[in-house]
Structure formats: C-alpha cells, structure tokens
Regions:
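Cofactor-binding beta-sheet edge motifs in enzyme active sites
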Residues: 2-738
Length: 738
C-alpha cells in the first residue's frame, strides 16, 4: 500500500483525555450538539472511533445497513489502517450530525441535477443540512478518506503512548492485530487507549504504513451476520416499549384525497381494539395486538374520495405518448445531428417500460413514542435527518425535539428514502399519547409504493457506409421524478437549484448519454405529467436507460451486420475498462456471437464509477423465458472486501432479473393493481440461474457496487431472447409473444 501524508489542516485535536479528534469545519457553524459519545470504559478517538477497556474497537458508521454490507466495509477500512484484530471490531451507528453528511449522494441520487453548482457549495449544503443519506452506491466512496484518516490518527496516538512508556521513538513502533509492538515489547490497544487519547497527533500524519494494510482487500466475515442468523438483530418492528399499542393503517389514492367513510362501530367490536384514528388522507386502527389492529382496519372498510385525475393504464400510456409527440428538452448533446436523421436509412425503435415496484421483504414500519415533550422514532430510513424533519413537521414539533434511531432494514432498494410511515407514526404517537408500533401490510406497501415510473423512449440512429454509427438520438418521455424527490426530501434552499431551472429533469434520464464514441448524438427529455407517485429504485433511471441504449446498440449492430461485442468494443476506444469487461464476459461465458438459436445476449454499463458487462443465456419453456446462466465481469476499482462485492453483484443480477421479467404493476383508480408477491413474478430459488462473477483487478479508486449489476441484465436477456425468437423485445417486463 502506498504511503500518504495528511496535514492537520482538516483536524482539530482535543485537549483533554478522551476528547479525541473532530473534523474542523472552520468556516461553518460548529453547533453540532450530537456527536459520538464514549460509553463506560471507552475512549473516544474523534468522530469515527472508540477503543474500549475490554479491547473492542468500535467504529462509528453513518450509513444504514440494508443488506449491502456497509456495517462491514466501513469498519474494515478503519481496522485496516489502525492495524486492529478483526475479531475485536464492533459497529455503532452515528448520531445525526453534519460531520456525517454525504454530499456525494446529492450527485448520484439526483443524476447530476446539481452539477452546475460548484462542488464546494454542494458540500456546504449537505453539511449545513446534515444530509445523511444512504444511497447511490456512495458509502465507501464518500467516507473512505475520513475513515482512513481516523484509523491512521488513532494508530499514531497509540504508537506515541506506547513509545512514551518504553522510552523509544514512536516511529520504531508498529501495530499488529490489535497490539502495539516494538521489538519484544507488546501492548494491547486496550492498555494504551486512555493515554493515547491525550496524545497529540503528528503532523504530517503517516497513512498506509506501520502495520496497516493487513486487512485491505480481504474477504473478512460480515459483522452483522451473526445477529441476523440468531435473530438478535433488531429491525424497526422489533422494538417493544411499555404500554405500546400496535397500529394498522390504510391510505387513499395519492392526490387530493379525503376520507369520506369508515365503519368505526365494526372496528370497535374487535376484541383488543384501543382506538380508531381518522386522518384526511388515511385511517388507522390501534389495538393490543397487530392481528387485532389489522382485523379492525378491515372492519373499518374505509372509503376515500379523490379529486382530479386518477392513474390508470390507459391514461399513463396516453400521457407518455403525448409527451413524446411534443417537443422535448435537450439535456445533453455532442456534435450536430442536423439532417443526419432525415431521409431513408434511419434505424428507429420505440421502447416502453412499465412501473416497477421496490417489493422489499420488510414492509415500511416504525415505532414511535412521545414523552416529556420529545418524540422518539425507531425507523427504517436511508435518510435519518430527512426523516426527522418529516416527522417533526407532521407532529408540529421543532426538529430538535425529535430523535430518529435508524434501524437495520430488510431490503429497501430506495424505498426507505421516503418517509410516509414516519409521518404517520409521529401523528399516531402524538394522538394516542402512548408508544405505537406501525407496520404496513404487504398490500399497503405495494399499493402505495413510490414506483420507478413508467417510461417511453424513441431511439433513432444512422450508420456510416463502414457500419459505424454517425448519429444517435434518444427521446425519453418520463415524469420529473428527480424534482419531485427534491421537493419531498431536500430543504427548499437546495431543492430549488435542481437543474438550475432547466425544464428537463437530470435524474429522470440519468444514464441516457451513450458511453460509445459517436460523433453526433443528443438526449432529449419529454416531460410527462403522470398522476402517480414515483421515487428512486435501485439502479435509478439507469434501469431503463440501459435497456433502451443497449437494445438499440444490438439493433444497430444487426443493421451493420457486425457481431454485437465487436460492434461495441469498436466504439469504446476511450473506455478501456468497459471494453475489458465486455471481452472478459464474452470469454468467460463462451460467447458465440449471439447467433440465431444460441440463447445468448450481452450488454455493458458504466455506473457510479464502475464498469460491468453481463452475458445472459436463456431458453424458452412453456411460453416463458427461463434464464440458465448469467456471467458478470466487474471493474469497480480497488476492492475493500471481495466477498461483499460478489454478494452485491449477485444480488444485483437477481434484482435485475426481477425487473426484467416482473416486479411491475398496472394502475386502476389511482392505485397499483398488485397486492402481493404472488402476482409480481419475482424470481424464486428454483428460477435462479447459474451465476459467475469475475472481479477485474484494478488500482483505480473504489467505485459503487450495490447497483452496478442491475441495469445490464434486462438488455442482455432481451438479446438472448431475440436470438431464440428472431423478434426484438422492446418492452419491460419481457414477455414472449403468443
């Protein structure tokens, strides 16, 4: 590992024992009331690290664990730099604080909507708003430097404390598996923590030396696995408080909705019912058990009235077609299309994508308690400070009177960026004056899911005489999902800068720019006004823009009479990492050119600083596609933990398979038709194909991995089905025509 030098400019050294180190935001307010706190027998080493008298190394993690392995990857970075024994490492969620803001998530979740705002200004926004976000595959990329500095600083302090006792130069000491060592002398970290906390950090600070690096890139076991296996891991619905009631809720369609009828008498006849709570937009039943609450809710048989247009399939398609027929907003371009797409010889294709649901195993849930003028929530959330603000508004409280405890999440895929359940739980706790446990039913979670929106696209291109593309035009009809998210989630002072007033929405068409070397291209966003709630889904807009782009590349390759992999690589002269992923996937998968009857298809993608290529192999059985094999090659830069990366790639492939073959819904009278997993056509264990994942060694900075595998699956599978049927598949989900 290379040796780096870090100055003290970004560090403030505390004066007393245990005061530790804090990041000094010299030009900004320092009213950070909530910071990491040392418990009994613990010594604080800044905002990221504590060492206990029992030898535990406790790493503060600001990101929420929802299966992606962040409770392991981030501590591994600290432990590696510190020279710790992995068996002694523990995790502690951080409190809400500007110290743990994630400005990179502003860029990734909103698809570059804020790119015209200087990066330092974006960073200041995030810090001032304490914008703690888990999403956009940003955790390692955002926090690696801070964590390495924290580990290196604590290591230096331990070395200096040991050197003082041994009366040697501290640079002659090293750390090794939880010990400070100099010759035959050894001290456990626990024996030095108290003295080390009062030492002064050296300037410059050595990083990446003296024992560090022993854990980097190693497949260390997950820290959260034992608790999840034995059932001791707590989720939001596991919290139990004295005098708590269980609540079931049912909401009306989105829009101008009001509750017009509920049979309170029928609900109150259910044994164990405590109260019925009516809200203009929803109704809830509280009871001594969750079963009684659900039975009472069914007895209420609520009816809602909604003014305005209600979402239905015909209306959605009509709105998308009207948007596509109108003039779009140019969001990105190069060269000049001019008359290149006029006249004969133009290749054209139209694509459609149905609304896609998150379909997480754990439904939205929250536990809330109001006492002594303070509201406390245990919540599944990817944005705890935003959830706190939402709950405070709903309860009519100041934000400082609300505490949010982010819990582990049983899958989220972006759904926990929104906080309807937090608002409902806050109102219920305030109304009932006792703790409440609110769990949405499976039907409620699907009906009111903020879906990845339905989208329609028209792709047009022209080939030169030698078969290479000279013109490319993508026209995408989609709602302004990014702006809607910004209005829901971000402070008004930040949200108003989305796209700096541009009529297009960067998030809605994220990933639409081709990675290929094409002289003349343009991407237009056609804003569609749809009466449904949309949100962020794993992979973002890349989940459909990759489908449009890669399927269209296949069609251009066929028109040119060129094999699809060669066609792509010929246009990737400026991206050797993506080209290598393609060639490696083809080699590992036994790619035969995607010829008729092969059942093979291939696609590639750049996302979150990483590159991926996916080859799919499929057959058709009883009129339905059966995926037999998926081969993925990934270049995600320097890897912290290869096992975690493989888990995320494998999970992303299965998630992409679900999005390709199902996980979608139609709409009727403003609500999703889907009510349960049984109608979502999600892959079962028996449907899981053979999966091969190859990680390409790289010294590039770490890229994101939790989403990278998702977008390439659908176009690869569409290519495989084309080779079997001779037909082009231009709609998601993929359905074999009768």
């Amino acid at each position: 590992m290379a040796t780096g030098r870090i100055t003290r400019r970004g560090l403030l050294v505390g004066g007393g024992a245990g005061a530790g180190l804090l990041v000094a935001w010299a030009l900004w307010p320092r009213r950070y009331a909530e910071t990491l706190v040392a418990g009994p027998g613990e010594r604080l080493f800044g905002a990221w690290l504590k060492i206990g008298e029992d030898g535990r190394v406790i790493v503060a993690v600001p990101q929420v664990e929802h299966g992606q392995g962040v409770f392991t990857a981030l501590p591994q970075i600290v432990a590696d730099e510190l020279g710790a024994d992995w068996r002694t490492v523990a995790v502690e969620p951080t409190p809400a604080s500007p110290l743990y803001a994630n400005p990179l998530a502003l860029d990734e979740l909103w698809g570059g909507a804020f790119d015209q705002v200087p990066a330092p200004v974006r960073g200041e926004w995030a810090k001032r708003a304490a914008l703690m976000l888990t999403g956009g595959s940003t955790s390692v990329r955002q926090f690696e430097d801070d964590l390495r500095i924290a580990g290196a600083t604590a290591r230096a302090l331990l070395l200096k404390a040991a050197a003082r006792r041994w009366d040697v130069d501290w640079t002659q000491c090293r750390t090794e598996a939880g010990f400070v060592v100099a010759g035959r002398n050894r001290f456990r970290f626990a024996e030095l923590a108290g003295a080390a906390a009062s030492e002064e950090a050296p300037d410059p600070l050595p990083q990446g030396v003296q024992g560090a690096g022993a854990l980097a890139g190693k497949p260390l076991p997950r820290l959260d696995a034992p608790a999840k296996v034995d059932g001791s891991a707590n989720f939001a619905a596991d919290i139990r408080l004295a005098d708590m009631v269980h609540v079931a809720v049912r909401a009306g369609p989105p829009g101008d909705t009001r509750l017009v009828r509920a049979d309170r008498a029928a609900a109150e006849r259910v044994a164990g019912v405590v109260a019925v709570i009516e809200n203009p937009r929803w109704v809830a039943a509280a009871a001594t058990t969750s079963w009684a609450a659900q039975r009472a809710l069914d007895g209420l048989a609520p009816r809602f009235e909604t003014r305005g247009v209600l979402a239905d399939d015909a209306g959605i398609e009509g709105a998308l077609r009207r948007a596509l027929a109108e003039e779009g907003h140019r969001v990105a371009s190069a060269g000049s299309l001019g008359q290149l797409l006029s006249g004969g010889g133009v290749v054209e294709a139209e694509f459609r994508v149905a609304p896609a649901l998150h379909a997480a195993i754990e439904t939205p849930s929250a536990t809330a308690s109001f006492h002594d003028g303070r509201l406390e929530l245990w919540l599944q959330t990817q944005a705890p400070t935003i959830a706190r603000a939402a709950a405070a508004r709903a309860a009519g409280l100041a934000e400082h009177a609300v505490t949010v405890h982010p819990m582990m999440i049983g899958g989220s895929f972006g759904a926990a960026l929104d906080h309807d359940v937090a608002e409902q739980a806050a109102v219920l706790a305030m109304t009932l004056k006792r703790p409440v446990s609110l769990i949405w039913s499976r039907g409620e979670s699907l009906i009111h899911d903020r879906c990845r929106p339905p989208v329609m696209a028209r792709m047009r291109g022209r080939l030169a005489a030698n078969g290479t593309p000279v013109a490319w035009h993508a026209q995408i009809a989609a709602p302004a999902t990014g702006r809607a998210m910004a209005e829901r989630m971000l402070p008004a002072s930040v949200a108003e800068f989305t796209d700096l007033g541009s009529p297009g929405d960067a998030q809605a068409i994220s990933g639409a720019v081709p990675p290929y070397r094409i002289a003349n291209w343009a991407v237009d966003h056609h804003l569609a006004d749809l009466p449904l709630q949309s949100g962020y889904l794993r992979g973002g807009a890349d989940g459909y823009t990759a489908f449009f782009k890669e399927c269209f590349v296949d069609e251009l390759a066929a028109t040119a009479g060129t094999e699809p992999v060669s066609f792509r690589i010929g246009m990737l002269g400026g991206d050797p990492r993506l080209a290598r992923c393609l060639s490696t996937a083809a080699s590992l998968g036994g790619w035969d050119g995607g010829v008729a009857g092969s059942g093979q298809g291939i696609a590639c993608r750049r996302l979150r600083g990483s590159a991926v290529a996916v080859m799919a192999e499929a057959r058709i059985e009883r009129g339905r596609p059966v995926v037999e094999r998926l081969v993925a090659t990934v270049d995600c830069g320097r890897v912290v933990n290869p096992d975690l990366v493989r888990q995320q790639i494998e999970g992303g492939l299965i998630f992409g398979l679900a999005q390709a073959l199902g996980a979608t819904t139609g709409y009727e009278r403003g609500l999703a038709r889907v009510r349960g997993f049984d109608t979502l056509h999600l892959p079962r264990l028996a449907d899981t194909p053979d999966i091969t994942v190859e990680l390409i060694r790289s010294d590039e900075p770490p890229g994101g991995v939790s989403e990278i595998a998702v977008p390439a699956v659908a176009p690869a599978l569409a290519g495989a089905l084309h080779s079997l049927t001779g037909k082009r598949f231009r709609s998601l989900p993929l359905v074999i025509p009768a």
